[in-house]
């Protein structure tokens, strides 16, 4: 039985939440393997919008959901989200949610440092959400992190927090010139959360591998997008974790040979939140139209998303980096009514045309997109249930995406709800 990884191919906000919610109906387990609560997944069920930031989207389908070792977790946010989902009538018992004992915890000092650092950068800021994700990953890399396993030993937890906060407070006071934090208060706060958290803590790697050996189907849910990847994204305007499909194995504790398919989610146009290069960004009425019709506001920050034409240089890059075996096209209906639709097929920079992503951020910032133009369609496609019922120009647009990317389209989404989805090939079946 197949195990499927779902990743974003752009800069996040591609509609992964809806697709994971849809595919979760066929999976037994759903796993989040990287990132933190700097990402938000939005699901619309029976007209009701539900947003999750840490708990995998599969919780809506009453599946067993795992938060892997590659995720950094703010325990306060996690418990707030569990309470929110519970208030919506969703089963959030420890039988449904498992947190890796090896996942790192976002501590109060991580958030203080994150916000102070961004403030100090001024105009050079990169647009972090200020939720402590980056500083937590820093501590993980330098072997100073606090993991969920540390909550099992109260004395050890207190000792580790006291030691690390001596350094963090020195940093806050002497470099950022901002308020310090009381170690005793932090320890007391987390010990107050301990009893609620302990039932959820699990060896996720063991549980997942055991389930796979028993034939359980697993869906791995990525956060953000390929071009926010710490290794392959538009560095330094990236997130602090690896967002590509290969990290599904490392970030959850399974072998890469157990990943069967990789589905790349691509919005029918391109958006980005925060700072960073964006070659196809539109500053005209079409960009405004995409933003308004697509309701392009971040689920986590509420920030207005920048909008532009579909960028095939990005998509081909994502296909290569992730080894995509299928594409999911989302928000296709947002393009309804446009007379002309453009696709970026390359970048031009000082007389040179790039058909691959340039590594130098300065080059990317100075690139001019090379476009090909396609006729749009006037019809409303949001109610269409069968691919063959699409207008001819819609089908030609989709065919061109498939041709340029070299990846087959498996699913097309024409609205926020589950029902507004056309499945061409269900890999779980």
Swiss-Prot record:
Homodimer. GO terms for molecular function: adenylosuccinate synthase activity; GTP binding; magnesium ion binding. This is Adenylosuccinate synthetase. Belongs to the adenylosuccinate synthetase family. The keyword Electron transport does not apply. One of its GO terms (biological process) is 'de novo' AMP biosynthetic process. Pfam families: Adenylsucc_synt (PF00709). Its main location: cytoplasm. Plays an important role in the de novo pathway of purine nucleotide biosynthesis. Catalyzes the first committed step in the biosynthesis of AMP from IMP. It catalyses: IMP + L-aspartate + GTP = N(6)-(1,2-dicarboxyethyl)-AMP + GDP + phosphate + 2 H(+). It comes from Desulforapulum autotrophicum (strain ATCC 43914 / DSM 3382 / VKM B-1955 / HRM2) (Desulfobacterium autotrophicum). Binds 1 Mg(2+) ion per subunit. SMART domains: Adenylsucc_synt. Substrate binds at residues 299-305. GO terms for cellular component: cytoplasm. InterPro entries: Adenylosuccin_syn_GTP-bd, Adenylosuccin_syn_Lys_AS, Adenylosuccinate_synth_dom1, Adenylosuccinate_synth_dom2, Adenylosuccinate_synth_dom3, Adenylosuccinate_synthetase, P-loop_NTPase. Transmembrane segments: none annotated. Mg(2+) binds at residues 13, 40. Keywords: Cytoplasm, GTP-binding, Ligase, Magnesium, Metal-binding, Nucleotide-binding, Purine biosynthesis.
């Amino acid at each position: 039985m197949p195990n499927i990884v779902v990743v974003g191919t752009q800069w996040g906000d591609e509609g992964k939440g809806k697709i994971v919610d849809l595919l979760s109906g066929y999976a037994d387990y759903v796993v989040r393997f990287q990132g933190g609560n700097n990402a938000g997944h939005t699901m619309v069920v029976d007209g009701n919008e539900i947003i999750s930031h840490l708990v995998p989207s599969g919780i809506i389908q009453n599946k067993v959901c795992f938060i892997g070792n590659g995720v950094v977790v703010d325990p306060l946010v996690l418990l707030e989200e569990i309470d929110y989902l519970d208030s919506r009538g969703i089963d959030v018992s420890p039988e449904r949610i498992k947190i890796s004992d090896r996942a790192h915890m976002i501590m109060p000092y991580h958030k203080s440092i994150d916000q102070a650092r961004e403030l100090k950068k001024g105009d050079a800021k990169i647009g972090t959400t200020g939720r402590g994700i980056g500083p937590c990953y820093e501590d993980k890399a330098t072997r100073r992190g606090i993991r969920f396993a540390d909550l099992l030993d109260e004395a050890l937890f207190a000792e580790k927090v006291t030691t690390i906060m001596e350094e963090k407070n020195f940093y806050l006071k002497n470099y950022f010139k901002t308020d310090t934090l009381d170690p005793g208060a932090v320890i007391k706060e987390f010990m107050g959360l301990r009893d609620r958290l302990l039932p959820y803590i699990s060896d996720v790697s063991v549980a997942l591998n055991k389930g796979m050996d028993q034939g359980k189907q697993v869906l791995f849910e990525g956060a953000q997008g390929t071009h926010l990847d710490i290794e392959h994204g538009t560095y330094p305007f990236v997130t602090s974790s690896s967002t590509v499909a290969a990290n599904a194995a490392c970030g959850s504790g399974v072998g890469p040979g157990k990943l069967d398919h990789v589905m790349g989610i691509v919005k029918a146009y391109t958006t980005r939140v925060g700072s960073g290069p964006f070659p196809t960004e539109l500053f005209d009425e079409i960009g405004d139209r995409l933003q308004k019709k697509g309701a392009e506001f971040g689920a986590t920050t509420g920030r207005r998303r920048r909008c532009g034409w579909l960028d095939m240089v990005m998509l081909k890059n994502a296909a290569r980096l992730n080894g995509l075996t299928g594409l999911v096209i989302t928000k296709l209906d947002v393009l309804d009514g446009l007379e002309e639709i453009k696709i970026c097929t390359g970048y031009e920079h000082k007389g040179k045309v790039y058909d691959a992503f340039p590594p130098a951020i300065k080059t990317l910032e100075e690139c001019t997109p090379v476009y090909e133009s396609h006729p749009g369609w006037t019809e409303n496609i949001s109610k269409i249930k069968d691919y063959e019922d699409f207008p001819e120009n819609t089908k030609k647009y989709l065919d061109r995406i498939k041709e340029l990317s070299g990846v087959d389209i498996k699913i097309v989404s024409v609205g926020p709800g589950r029902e507004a989805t056309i499945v061409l090939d269900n890999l779980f079946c």
